[in-house]
């Protein structure tokens, strides 16, 4: 990055309802969007033919639109199904990459469904306990500590 930024340099970009830092390199700037990790950001930049050394604020509007179309429709750009974060969706059986607010909604809907059907995972979420088989005898305690009274 040069010491003097040109006039069209954007310090903060608004992409998919998220503020993206324009001073970061494009691959790492995309990771600030929920649902996009480093691996997906890397492959999206390669598919869009964007220079990886460019900063996010240096991108043109056309390049940003190109990146967002690839994120919205990754299967059309030959990104494999195993790369996506929503595989064989419960309702429609489709493969998709869910990002930003849609990711929060899908996660909340999944947890509500698990709670509604009284699934073991759903019940653990409902009770506020650990879900993934961790031990809970000594760790994960909340509330006031109860001391041991001394014998007299």
Curated annotation (Swiss-Prot):
State its location(s): Cytoplasm
Record key words, sorted: Acetylation, Cytoplasm, Ribonucleoprotein, Ribosomal protein, RNA-binding, rRNA-binding
Keyword presence, Zinc: no
* Domain of life from the UniProt record: Eukaryota
Q: Which GO terms describe its cellular component?
A: cytosol; cytosolic ribosome; cytosolic small ribosomal subunit; nucleolus; nucleus; plant-type cell wall; plant-type vacuole; plasma membrane
Q: Which residues carry this modification: N-acetylserine?
A: 2
Annotated GO biological processes are: translational initiation
User: Chief location of this protein?
Assistant: cytoplasm
- What InterPro entries does the record tag this protein with? Rbsml_uS13_C (IPR027437), Ribosomal_uS13 (IPR001892), Ribosomal_uS13-like_H2TH (IPR010979), Ribosomal_uS13_CS (IPR018269)
Q: Name one GO molecular function term.
A: rRNA binding
- Function noted in UniProt: Located at the top of the head of the 40S subunit, it contacts several helices of the 18S rRNA.
| Family affiliation | Belongs to the universal ribosomal protein uS13 family.
Q: What is this protein called?
A: Small ribosomal subunit protein uS13z/uS13y/uS13x
Which species is this UniProt entry from?
A: Arabidopsis thaliana
Gene field:
RPS18A
């Amino acid at each position: 990055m040069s010491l003097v930024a040109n006039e069209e340099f954007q310090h903060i970009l608004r992409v998919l309802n998220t503020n993206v830092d324009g001073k970061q390199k494009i691959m790492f700037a995309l990771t600030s969007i929920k649902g996009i990790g480093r691996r997906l950001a890397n492959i999206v930049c390669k598919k869009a033919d964007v220079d990886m050394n460019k900063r996010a604020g240096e991108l043109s509007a056309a390049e940003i639109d190109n990146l967002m179309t690839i994120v919205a429709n990754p299967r059309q750009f030959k990104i494999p199904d195993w790369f996506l974060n929503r595989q064989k969706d419960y309702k429609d059986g489709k493969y998709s990459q869910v990002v930003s607010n849609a990711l929060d909604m899908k996660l909340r809907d999944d947890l509500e469904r698990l709670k509604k059907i009284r699934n073991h995972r759903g019940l653990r979420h409902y009770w506020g306990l650990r879900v993934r088989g961790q031990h809970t005898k000594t760790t994960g305690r909340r509330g006031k500590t109860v001391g041991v009274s001394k014998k007299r």
